[in-house]
């Protein structure tokens, strides 16, 4: 498996994420962009609710492939093919920016993210005004 269109192989059993997840939104958006009918994917309707549950389904032999995050795949001895980078923000009231606990939070995120495969903390000192 190297790309979304590889899921069209009927011999490949797919395990999906639930419809409300960001992972599912990523998949469904990719399918629309590539003109792929989800009903042609073997297992598209089989859903799990966490990245770990997807990994466990693959390990249990219930599926051959599913979408998930790198650290969960590697923790479970599974292969990983990156499809997309995502950017997350920390949202807080302006008053919190000068609070010492906010600085501690940023340091912890930097420390933790550097230890988890697939994650990196970038631009944590940059403030984004009116990002909504």
Q: Which residues does each predicted region cover?
A:
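N-terminal hydrophobic or amphipathic helices and topogenic motifs
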Residues: 2, 11-13, 112-132
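Short acidic active-site motifs
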Residues: 2-3, 53-54
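Short loop->beta-strand "edge-of-pocket" segments that line small-molecule binding or catalytic clefts
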Residues: 5-27
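Short helix-loop-beta junction
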Residues: 32-37
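Short beta-strand-to-loop elements that line the ligand-binding cleft
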Residues: 38-50
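A ligand-binding cleft/hinge motif common to bilobed small-molecule-binding domains
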Residues: 55-84
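Periplasmic-binding protein-like
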Residues: 78-107, 122-132
């Amino acid at each position: 498996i190297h790309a979304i269109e590889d899921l069209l192989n009927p011999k490949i059993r797919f395990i999906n994420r639930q419809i409300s997840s960001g992972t599912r939104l990523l998949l469904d958006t990719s399918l629309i962009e590539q003109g792929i009918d989800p009903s042609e994917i073997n297992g598209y309707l089989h859903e799990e609710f966490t990245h770990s549950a997807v990994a466990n389904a693959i390990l249990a032999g219930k599926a051959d492939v599913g979408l998930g995050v790198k650290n969960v795949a590697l923790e479970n001895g599974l292969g990983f093919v990156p499809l997309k980078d995502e950017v997350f923000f920390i949202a807080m009231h302006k008053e919190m920016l000068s609070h010492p606990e906010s600085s501690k939070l940023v340091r912890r995120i930097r420390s933790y993210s550097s230890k988890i495969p697939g994650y990196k903390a970038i631009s944590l000192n940059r403030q984004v005004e009116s990002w909504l």
